[in-house]
């Protein structure tokens, strides 16, 4: 699945201004962060789908920062809170209006600046939500309504983003987990990107976070959401797409991945959002790759779902898992070779291993000729191999002979 910065949004007669705005929004959202393009993608998909998201992973991976930036770039009303086991409803939904209670006997909350009036929200440690909070939160997520005394308020909430270290086991939390359509396992920045991360971090420490002007309005986002529903409507008549989608759902279930009927239906909405996200008003089989953010129930499912979809739709992106393994081996070799003394006998075996990896990379590049993401990763890994070769040459004149 390609990222928006690599997509040209076109429609008959010229460019589409709204989709150009969406591309600008995505680029501005991901720009300050190192290796957080995928998280930005999930945020955009969630907003386009008018659905909610769970980020799973350890603290300190910029989850709340990138969501806050999304709200800022949209000039959206934003609410943020870290939940614990003792969080009271007042903290999320507003304190009781004592005046209303005294004068009218109505149990009403003062909701200004609280979750019911937010357009984008982030709840950290969401599964700390207790029983007193759960029912109200579920109504807000599912129906976008908040009962406030004798008044039913329609919440403007577009998407709620949340974070947790783990997936909940408790039965009472499963309904909440199910309401979060998008699920993404956030990993720390890879070793190859650490220098960039440090530089960016130092820049923030010295100059602070620079706030950018909004690049898109909520009203424009809602118009693009209408396009998602238009694509979803068209998909009803796409027998080829529905047949392939049904096959995927069957395979997921056969592989032991639990997919409820409701999640399967919602998954089609995510697929339609991905088509719009990539500048199309129709679904293609490659849009099914978005299911890696929708179908997983456990941590182990994330890799499994991506592999199943890649294999079934024959996408070049099935090579991404292979590239991750090759990258780990390359970085291991670089680390071990740096420690070698000159003329060490292991240089020959390392050279041969490096050559095998290089051949595998070039084979992947030939087979995935149309996948820019794969080709870019191959190119970067080949550059690292080139650097390692230079290091080997400096350690032993035998290197060239043994390749």
Question: Residue ranges of each PLM-predicted region?
Answer:
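Conserved alpha-helical scaffold flanking the Walker A/P-loop in AAA+ ATPase domains
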Residues: 42-45, 99-121
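Post-Walker A helix-loop "phosphate-sensing" segment adjacent to the P-loop in P-loop NTPases
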Residues: 72-81, 98-101, 143-145
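Walker A/P-loop
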Residues: 44-85
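Basic, amphipathic alpha-helical bundle interface domains used for macromolecular binding and assembly
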Residues: 205-303
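Conserved NTP-binding/hydrolysis module of P-loop NTPases
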Residues: 84-104
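Canonical AAA+ ATPase core
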Residues: 99-104, 120-136, 141-217, 228-231, ...
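Pre-Walker A (pre-P-loop) alpha-helix and adjacent loop at the N terminus of AAA/AAA+ ATPase modules
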Residues: 16-58
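C-terminal engagement/docking regions of AAA+ P-loop ATPases
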Residues: 7-9, 254, 258, 276-403
């Amino acid at each position: 699945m390609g990222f928006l910065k690599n997509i040209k949004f076109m429609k008959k007669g010229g460019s589409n201004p709204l989709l150009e705005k969406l591309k600008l929004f995505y680029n501005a959202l991901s720009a300050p962060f190192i290796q957080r393009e995928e998280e930005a993608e999930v945020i955009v998909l969630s907003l386009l789908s008018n659905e909610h998201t769970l980020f799973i992973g350890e603290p300190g991976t910029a989850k709340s920062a990138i969501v806050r930036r999304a709200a800022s770039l949209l000039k959206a009303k934003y609410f943020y809170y870290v939940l614990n086991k003792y969080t009271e409803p007042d903290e999320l939904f507003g304190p009781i209006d004592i005046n209303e209670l005294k004068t009218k006997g109505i149990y009403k909350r003062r909701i200004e600046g609280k979750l019911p009036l937010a357009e984008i929200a982030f709840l950290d440690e969401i599964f700390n939500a207790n029983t007193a909070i759960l029912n109200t939160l579920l109504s807000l997520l599912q129906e976008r309504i908040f009962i406030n005394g004798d008044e039913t308020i329609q919440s403007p909430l577009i998407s709620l983003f949340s974070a947790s270290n783990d997936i909940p086991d408790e039965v009472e939390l499963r309904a909440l987990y199910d309401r979060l359509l998008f699920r993404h396992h956030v990993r720390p920045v890879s070793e190859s990107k650490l220098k960039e991360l440090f530089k960016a971090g130092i820049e923030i420490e010295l100059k602070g976070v620079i706030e950018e002007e909004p690049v898109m309005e909520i009203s424009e986002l809602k118009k693009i959401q209408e396009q998602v529903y238009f694509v979803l409507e068209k998909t009803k008549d796409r027998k080829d797409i529905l047949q392939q989608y049904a096959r995927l759902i069957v395979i997921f279930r056969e592989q032991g991945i639990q997919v409820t009927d409701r999640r399967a239906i919602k998954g089609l909405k995510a697929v339609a959002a991905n088509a719009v996200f990539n500048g199309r008003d129709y679904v293609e089989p490659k849009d099914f790759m978005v299911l890696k953010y929708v179908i997983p129930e456990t941590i182990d499912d994330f890799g499994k779902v991506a592999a199943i979809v890649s294999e079934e739709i024959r996408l070049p992106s099935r090579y991404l898992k292979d590239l991750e393994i090759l990258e780990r081996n390359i970085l291991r070799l670089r680390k071990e070779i740096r420690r070698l003394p000159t003329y060490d006998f292991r240089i020959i075996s390392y050279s041969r291993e490096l050559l095998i990896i290089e051949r595998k990379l070039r084979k992947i590049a030939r087979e995935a000729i149309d996948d820019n993401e794969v080709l870019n990763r191959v190119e970067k890994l080949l550059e690292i191999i080139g650097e390692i070769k230079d290091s080997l040459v400096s350690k032993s004149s035998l290197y060239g002979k043994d390749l």
